[in-house]
């Protein structure tokens, strides 16, 4: 079973476009687990208005993006997810994102993370760049030795990655005090399992003034 997990917080402005892009994936067999992190705007009523049976809505108090995603990982594991894909509330997924990434995560013998390239858009949805990997000068290792590279340059964005069940089980107890979940999980995969890069753009990642961090929005 595939689980897409999303943490929301005061995201009503961009959320409909992202939800629609996820729910219109060409690979349709998945659940979308959404945890609202104590929003004070219209995010929760908006989410309640979606009737797609694949959506699982959790409403909680504000604990911050990292802890919120930790709770989502636990829920995905509890529901038996074999693959988990992280989803920001303000991006736009290309229609075949899951279809392109799912085959790469069928491996079950080792903890594995797959991440892809992406393009960028601004707050108005205007395309601001093509390949992020190329424009940022990311040095993606060709030999599969990701651990030292990730220590020097944490370039795995959660919004563009997925993990298998083995890595999910290693990610259920994220340490307190880490800034974001994606770097920690990527380092865990690189040290104890496998990391694979898909050199294709699978999402439009939105950079705007309200992103959760300068690297990646919540």
Predicted regions and their residues:
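Nucleotide-sugar donor-binding/catalytic module of glycosyltransferases
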Residues: 1-217
């Amino acid at each position: 079973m595939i689980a897409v997990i999303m943490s929301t917080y005061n995201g009503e402005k961009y959320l409909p476009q992202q939800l629609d892009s996820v729910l219109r994936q060409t690979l349709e067999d998945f659940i979308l687990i959404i945890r609202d992190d104590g929003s004070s705007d219209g995010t929760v009523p908006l989410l309640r208005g979606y009737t797609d049976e694949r959506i699982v809505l959790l409403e909680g108090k504000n604990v911050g993006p990292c802890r919120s995603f930790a709770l989502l990982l636990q829920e995905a594991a509890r529901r038996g997810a074999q693959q988990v894909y992280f989803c920001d509330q303000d991006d736009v997924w290309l229609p075949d994102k899951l279809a392109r990434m799912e085959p790469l995560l069928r491996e079950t013998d080792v903890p594995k993370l797959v991440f892809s390239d992406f393009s960028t858009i601004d707050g108005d949805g205007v395309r601001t760049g093509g390949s992020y990997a190329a424009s940022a000068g990311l040095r993606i290792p060709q030999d599969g030795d990701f651990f030292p590279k990730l220590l020097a340059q944490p370039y795995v964005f959660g919004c563009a990655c997925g993990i298998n069940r083995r890595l999910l089980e290693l990610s259920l107890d994220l340490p307190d005090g880490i800034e974001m979940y994606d770097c920690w999980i990527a380092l865990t995969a690189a040290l104890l399992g496998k990391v694979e890069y898909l050199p294709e753009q699978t999402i439009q990642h939105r950079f705007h003034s309200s992103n959760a961090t300068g690297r990646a929005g919540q």
